[in-house]
């Protein structure tokens, strides 16, 4: 037979809520780990007194009774696993697995039996139901009744609030049966009563959640928070974990108490109790117990009189009374040297602590995520700025936690930590390892090339050019003075028959067509294009490098070897720091090299400039010749459309600009054309006068 047995999907009932987990049996005993809370229960083999196998709602289950009276129940076994468990308990624990059935008659009368921490309601010899007395929060008595109230679990959809037992009076004069029943319940119940004096009291401690200042009274079985408005009583059995976390400023400390079930303030539930301490606060603590009692109860963990920092006193007392280890940050160190990362969760900023077995975020709202709950993590670029990134965690329950606005410098440290803990990284395939991913952030500085911005600028220039071309065409087409004057003549001219006669209509249409053709042939004045950037002559000497750049080129590989995986920006920063701290003697060598390079450059430039003018003059002549050709071609195109065709057209259109008349007078045409143009020029004046009359 195997030395160990393991069972998955085994359920444990916790105040009405069924939590799944993993059960492991070994020679040393039995261990159960709750998947939801991560809480581990250990039962040594020597403590197991009795084991019962029975049919339950979730298949089959076992009930273990220990020598100390504690009861543990685990459900979810299959019927076929009975033989395997029977042999294992018998061979390794020397205990027989007894099979017992529950009574299903549905009667509401029977006998009550108290055994260990259980109240069993039996009908005949079979139990109908069992109540864990540790779940009882209050017990009150009436004339013939006993009422039990129970602690509530927020995770259970249906909860048992209270139950009443009718206790019939007896004929015996031995005592009150109702009172005896209540005393049996109270002796094992988890009823919080401040009986006796507190072990110690911490005055006016600053509490972040729930917010306020509270006096904390430490009792043997529970913690009492007394504030100005609210009081809380926290049983030590509800404490899951303790955390002691240093603040980023290294002057304060967080002490975090994880609770299940949480404490309530109205409709608000607090799963974490967070205390904030200053490292400078000291105190001397004296326990309200004798030396012998302190030694017997705490076995050297505490002393009657202690002195030290306030946060150390609180954490030591809590650790001894709750009997839980205090979790502190592991070996993670951020970019600034602290053990936490500044980030934002939901609407508030706080601190994220990478621990050895999980992450914890403080303080609003506090979040604790264990590594075994995590499905994968994701490093995402920040939404508002590229100087930060987001860290996303997805859990097996389907929840997602996004910690945003993390400084870009923390990326490498956090990535290494996640890699070392072997957590699955969701976007690892998108980039080849850590360095390219980090370079994505490094290349997004404001002074780096932004392709998107350049593209948008180009599109804007093209749009502006298109708009200006369209507006130019529109103005050219709309500015047709002949057509406008024709409309005015038809409406206001005293003798419009000359322009509207049938004999001249055909000639007018032909002239208009000729004008349109001339317009198509006519070339627009070329718009001045922005001068292109002067292309640098590849044969020209290169500018000399500065002393720093000469040193950087020589030392780059050395810096890379000393800092493996360093990014381009970090390498530049590192080099700048080294150069800044370098002594003047070492810098003189590189200054001398820079001076030599400068002299060589000046010498090369003189030689280059002596040969350069000949080439420049050739280019200049070439460009001048091209300009002259363009001017002559423009004049040729403008000549045919200006005097000959414009004159007959403007006979009917009755318009001629003054500039056009002067240019025609100065031309070398014959005298007949001169007279025609002068007559045409005089026509608008007479028409204008008649129109004005």
Swiss-Prot record:
UniProt biased composition (Polar residues): 683-693
Keyword ATP-binding: no
Composition bias, Basic residues: 514-531
Region annotation Disordered: where it falls in the sequence: 460-693
SMART domains documented for this protein: HMG, Rtt106
Biased composition (Low complexity): 494-503
InterPro entries with a match to the protein in the record: HMG_box_dom, HMG_box_dom_sf, PH-like_dom_sf, RTT106/SPT16-like_middle_dom, RTT106/SSRP1_HistChap/FACT, SSRP1-like_PH1, SSRP1/POB3, SSRP1/POB3_N
GO biological process entries: DNA repair; DNA replication; regulation of chromatin organization
Pfam family, one: POB3_N
Top-level taxon: Eukaryota
DNA-binding region per UniProt: 541-609
A GO MF label: histone binding
Ranges of compositional bias, category Basic and acidic residues: 571-606
Entry-linked PROSITE patterns: HMG_BOX_2
Family named by the database record: Belongs to the SSRP1 family.
Function: Component of the FACT complex, a general chromatin factor that acts to reorganize nucleosomes. The FACT complex is involved in multiple processes that require DNA as a template such as mRNA elongation, DNA replication and DNA repair. During transcription elongation the FACT complex acts as a histone chaperone that both destabilizes and restores nucleosomal structure.
Subunit and partners: Component of the FACT complex (also known as the DUF complex), a stable heterodimer of ssrp1 and supt16h. May also be a component of a ck2-spt16-ssrp1 complex which forms following UV irradiation, composed of ssrp1, supt16h, csnk2a1, csnk2a2 and csnk2b. The FACT complex may also interact with vcp.
Name of the protein in its database record: FACT complex subunit SSRP1
Recorded name of the encoding gene: ssrp1
